[in-house]
């Protein structure tokens, strides 16, 4: 796993010998933050590549295939998303998409690793201007908190219309973000009508983790939906889970608000295709 200088390539190896790789021109930056090893590469055809502990987080060319699909389905399904919490997402891409919605009055991003925010600001062109305003506390609709998202959610008195978890994969340290206890904290901090969304890993390679998270969410939320999308740089299709609190229909989105968004990957036509999981995965999920 990692950078092969002789081959000028970065390869992330998934379970069962499956790999995703990029040809790279050079390594731009590497450091050991308080929490993880962080690397940034310049690829040959996909812009810059952000890697945490050997796992691909994003490539600049195509990052919208993840951020748009994580954010806009829940934002457009909610009737009036005014307060939004983002846990993780230190590169700024998720919050950038949240703030496209003019209904949003306040968004809070809680990122545990300040090093990710700083490196993303210095080296990536994903949300540089937004991160600059957040760091300087000059973004009127959003706030950056450097801290533990699990602890923040448990202790905050804030209530949210939408909670978005943009974390690393549902293995290792991030497993707490996929626990029943965490889901209960999230449910409690949602308003009467609320939506929760999280990425849930590779459909094919993290199937067991997807099933575990889905099962735990079903114990907590009023309804739970699953969907998938091909994400550039990941072992796609990539899965997402949505938890519903109250009277919100995630299968229906606000078409008028959707028309105002000039997006690259996601649109109302795409929304209808999100739920097309492979048959064997549907059978496994529906058996939970």
Curated annotation (Swiss-Prot):
Enzyme class: transferase
Residue stretches making up the PABS domain: 11-245
Catalytic activity: S-adenosyl 3-(methylsulfanyl)propylamine + agmatine = N(1)-(3-aminopropyl)agmatine + S-methyl-5'-thioadenosine + H(+); S-adenosyl 3-(methylsulfanyl)propylamine + putrescine = S-methyl-5'-thioadenosine + spermidine + H(+); cadaverine + S-adenosyl 3-(methylsulfanyl)propylamine = aminopropylcadaverine + S-methyl-5'-thioadenosine + H(+)
SUPFAM superfamilies for the chain: S-adenosyl-L-methionine-dependent methyltransferases (SSF53335)
Residues involved in spermidine binding: 67, 91, 166-169
A biological process term (GO) from this entry: polyamine biosynthetic process
Keyword line: Cytoplasm, Polyamine biosynthesis, Spermidine biosynthesis, Transferase
A Gene Ontology cellular-component term: cytoplasm
EC nos: 2.5.1.104, 2.5.1.-, 2.5.1.16
Taxonomy, superkingdom: Archaea
Pfam families: Spermine_synt_N (PF17284), Spermine_synth (PF01564)
Binding residue positions for S-methyl-5'-thioadenosine: 36, 111, 148-149, 173
Alphabetized PANTHER family for the sequence: SPERMIDINE SYNTHASE, SPERMIDINE/SPERMINE SYNTHASE
Protein name per the record: Polyamine aminopropyltransferase
